Swiss-Prot record:
Tagged with keyword Manganese: no
Species of the source: Helicobacter pylori (strain J99 / ATCC 700824) (Campylobacter pylori J99)
Key word Ribonucleoprotein present: yes
Keywords: Ribonucleoprotein, Ribosomal protein, RNA-binding, rRNA-binding
This protein's name: Large ribosomal subunit protein uL3
Gene designation per UniProt: rplC
Function of the molecule: One of the primary rRNA binding proteins, it binds directly near the 3'-end of the 23S rRNA, where it nucleates assembly of the 50S subunit.
Any one GO MF annotation of this record: structural constituent of ribosome
């Protein structure tokens, strides 16, 4: 089973051994279509919608707030309507997939933890990457060379232990951290 979640943020448990935890809000979703163990679901995200979304809402008899669609693995879901959240109460471990924080175009020191050059004593080699190849052979830059470039905004999946799930407020508490900023949307699935 897969579920759509929004990251609330991080906190910690208040006991003898303080444990860092991540709080995730499980999004309410409506199952519109079931096919081969996969479900097309609609969920609420932002207020924006257009004529194409309006047509989908009319087709599946959805209210205006359900304006985004996603395909989830839903092997236990048998009928259309609200997505069944009963599986979350018994989960022990989940795989959480989120996009990392985007850092734009970053240099080699930030992106790859290069040491950099001397800061003073007449040096003019501070944050540069340095040499990127050999000599006449191979006469080109090797594939996979660590260089400056776009950093972050990549999909990252990690396994976390489930500490608790509050059905009323639909908040899932995971041990440890997950990628992304507070407020980021992602997915969780049972391991």
């Amino acid at each position: 089973m897969e579920f759509l979640v929004q990251k609330i943020g991080m906190s910690r448990t208040i006991d003898a051994n303080s444990t860092p935890v991540t709080l995730l809000k499980v999004l309410q979703a409506k199952v519109c279509q079931l096919e081969n163990g996969k479900a097309l679901v609609a969920y609420a995200m932002h207020k924006k919608y257009n004529k194409a979304i309006e047509g989908q809402q009319k087709k599946y008899q959805l209210s205006k707030e359900f304006n985004h669609f996603a395909t989830l693995k839903a092997s236990q879901q048998k009928e259309l309507g609200d997505l069944d959240l009963s599986a979350l109460e018994t989960l022990k471990r989940v795989k959480a997939s989120f996009k990392t924080k985007g850092r734009g175009f970053a240099g080699v020191m930030k992106r790859w933890n290069f040491q950099g050059g001397p800061a003073a004593h007449g040096s003019r080699f501070h944050r540069r990457p340095g040499s990127i190849g050999n000599r006449e052979w191979p006469g080109r830059v090797q594939k996979g060379r660590k260089m400056a470039g776009h950093y972050g905004n990549e999909l990252v999946t990690c396994q976390n232990e489930v500490l608790s799930f509050d059905k009323e407020s639909m908040v899932l508490v995971l041990k440890g951290s997950v990628a992304g900023f507070s407020g980021a949307y992602g997915r969780i699935r049972a391991v």
